[in-house]
Amino acid sequence: FTTRGNASKMLEEALAYARAHDLPPVYILIDEYDNFTNQLLTSYNDPLYEKVTTADSFLRTFFKVIKKGIGEGSIRTCFCTGVLPVTMDDLTSGYNIAEILTLESDFINMLGFTHAEADAYLRYVLDKYTGSQERYDEIWQLIVNNYDGYRFSPKGEKLFNATILTYFLKKFAVNKGEVPEEMIDENLRTDIGWLRRLTLSLENSKAMLDALVIDNGLYYNVADLSSKFNKQKFFDKNFYPVSLFYLGMTTLFNDYRMMLPNLTMRSIYMDYYNVLNRIDGGAMRYAPVYERFTQERDFESLVQNYFEQYLGQFPACLLYTSDAA
């Protein structure tokens, strides 16, 4: 390359070389190109976000080169994955040849592993690393509870999260067939700051978490599941369910309600809930009783400890409402 450090110029040079040497058209695959813009949005760096996504920013310029290459025939197609609709909205005015496939029924199952795929995956791992299918039912139920449950259209089939299922099976294989102690991929946990940024206030954050972890869902308008929307809408209080959906945090339960898809996401959101509501989860509250339970199997003391030490920190009105529901 004669111009280094400028992605747009480098791509132009590569395409010019392909044309000059009569090479086949180029296929471009771009994954999570908006990862850095998501970080800018959730870190309150709106001015820099505007700078990199609008006018003649490097991001828009890069996609203009792709558009030109497709028009000239040096690029056969460009396929982008892992892109938030808010970034698509800021880019597609200049890259107006894009067709958004996210919610198309023929492509939905690309977003995770189907049950048939996960079944084959698990059986392969069991055969290779344990030598038998004896524990299939046990492990299958474990992965369904923790990694399944993602639905990307109201009537679509449930899918496994491919990333966290692979995390588990990799650990399972390394442990020679032993279930890993840590069931949650730490990459899923993000700083509580992003939640406050999305909801814009502590009270809004608490209300949203109450709906998700206590009432078991957020109501949404199915018409809002558009393939792109602007930044202002992304942070609108009435739009939280859809914003969370596109961030991969919630899933569609039906045409009216979104919910947390599995125990993994529920555990993560419960941690958020505890932090925002200052609920103490320290070991001294629970560990002594847990230790005694492993020796004496005193289930009554275990339950009593849970009610006194954990639920005892919740406001009485919240417990009453939850029990009544």
Q: PLM features: what roles do these ranges have?
A:
Residues 1-316:
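Phosphate-binding site recognition
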Residues 320-325:
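Conserved small/polar residues in nucleotide/adenosyl-binding loops
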